[in-house]
Amino acid sequence: MEQKSIRKAIIPAAGWGTRFLPQTKAMPKEMLPIVDKPVIQYVVEEAVAAGIEDVILVTGWHKRAIEDHFDRSLELEKYLQARGKKKEFSEIKRIAELANFIYIRQKGDLYGNAIPIITAEPVVGDEFFAVLWGDEFIWADPPRLSQMLKVYKKYKGAVISAVRIEKK
């Protein structure tokens, strides 16, 4: 297969978030805020900055808030415009237009990191793609995905990221 640029990213976001209970009983862990936005928004923005065009979010039945976050809300937009809240209006519109969002509902009681990737196979086809965890935020300069795509282009093969953890 000829090497092409990576345009698609799969973001698994179907888990229960049990390590964060009780906070995640009513809110997906991917929607937990870091400062002023949910962690998954940082992940999507990093992907888009690295050249990703199609963001494939593999979610579960209890993750509707993720879809709502990245979707347009015409009622909210109208409300904000009527009250002159231009900054807020621009930001929610920008979020909805970050990428081409594709949502896939993970079915059944299957569990594991490979299941969302297999679930997204019909959308990805035979293209190379990135996998980003919807609840993982790593601050790096340059951003981690950009670093990985640079390695991918240089060596023309799969790339896995690792983080060194200091012993205490």
Language-model segments: residues:
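N-terminal glycine-rich phosphate-binding loop and ensuing alpha1 helix
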Residues: 2-82, 101, 106, 142-147
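Conserved beta-loop-beta/alpha segment of the NTase-like Rossmann-fold superfamily
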Residues: 76-78, 86-168
